[in-house]
Amino acid sequence: MSSSPSRNPTNAEAPPPPPTSTDAVAEGSSKKVRKPYTITKSRESWTEEEHDKFLEALQLFDRDWKKIEDFVGSKTVIQIRSHAQKYFLKVQKNGTLAHVPPPRPKRKAAHPYPQKASKNAQMPLQVSTSFTTTRNGDMPGYASWDDASMLLNRVISPQHELATLRGAEADIGSKGLLNVSSPSTSGMGSSSRTVSGSEIVRKAKQPPVLHGVPDFAEVYNFIGSVFDPETRGHVEKLKEMDPINFETVLLLMRNLTVNLSNPDLESTRKVLLSYDNVTTELPSVVSLVKNSTSDKSA
């Protein structure tokens, strides 16, 4: 009778040992451990003076952060960019009237970023409404209503002239200031004054009268009345105008003369010349303009 082989417990397969802590560390070392985020420096608040300098630097340098840093003087580029981002979002959310420079284009953009002026340059809020007029008696360059020498190859757009004249009406800067350059009564110089935003608010119930800004209602009412057969006394009205309105009428009448001298507007010119006022009132107005110019140049 044969005996069955004896079972030896040592020959049985042993279960794998549990992983040790050293194995876990070796496996985890293959993955990059993310460094915890810590605020190493407390956020610095901006004083009102620093914020005003920041707004002024935006007007001068747009998004040139290095120049803005030099202009502010007490903040780094990182702090300025963070402050600018929050400021731009606030302006966009509130819809306030403020200068937000366009984003800088990429390096290979077709239109590179325009070069800004230096610190010592004036802020670009200043607008000029000076009018240039000829000062000799013959007024070269100024033609009478039917002078054929005024035929030009281009037509000056009245909208362009209007946009130029209205440039001083509303551009309130970041500090609530309106800087207006106005021509002198002689038309040869200019003066500048500053209007605060609070002053504009206080006078909201009254139409603000800014020196150097023409009264466009009076100007265009006068020009329109030249073609009204029921209206007389244009010379007297022109004499009573303020110098700035007088210069504006002169500028627009010259522009109108140039446009109507274009051959494409010959039919319109003939219709206007058929009005009684154009043949009776307008020559006296033109004569007064010439005489006034001669008096100023004397």
Curated annotation (Swiss-Prot):
Induction is noted as: Circadian-regulation. Peak of expression in the afternoon, and lower levels in darkness. Down-regulated by cold.
Per UniProt, which keywords does this protein have? Answer: Biological rhythms, DNA-binding, Nucleus, Transcription, Transcription regulation
Gene3D superfamilies per the UniProt record, alphabetical:
Homeodomain-like (1.10.10.60)
Question: What GO biological process term is on the record, naming one?
Answer: positive regulation of circadian rhythm
GO molecular-function term, one example from the UniProt record: DNA-binding transcription factor activity
One Pfam family, short name please?
Answer: Myb_DNA-binding
* CDD domains in UniProt: SANT
Domain (HTH myb-type): residue spans on this chain:
38-92
Which Gene Ontology CC terms are recorded?
nucleus
Annotated DNA-binding ranges come to 65-88
Residue ranges for the region (Disordered) are 1-44, 96-123
Q: What happens when the gene is disrupted?
A: Delay and reduction in levels of evening-phased clock gene transcripts, and long circadian period. Under constant red plus blue light, extended free-running circadian period in single, double and triple mutants lacking RVE8 and either RVE4 or RVE6, or both of them. Monochromatic blue and red lights have opposite effects on the period of triple mutants rve468 lacking RVE4, RVE6 and RVE8; lack of blue light-specific increase in expression of some circadian clock genes. In long day conditions, rve468 plants have a larger size and a delayed flowering.
Q: Where in the cell is it found?
A: Nucleus
Give the misc comment: Subject to temperature associated alternative splicing producing mainly non-productive mRNAs.
Function (record text):
Transcriptional activator of evening element (EE)-containing clock-controlled genes. Forms a negative feedback loop with APRR5. Regulates the pattern of histone H3 acetylation of the TOC1 promoter. RVE4, RVE6 and RVE8 are components of the circadian system acting synergistically to regulate flowering time, redundantly to regulate leaf growth, and antagonistically to regulate hypocotyl elongation; their action seems independent of ZTL and HY5.
Q: What is this protein called?
A: Protein REVEILLE 8
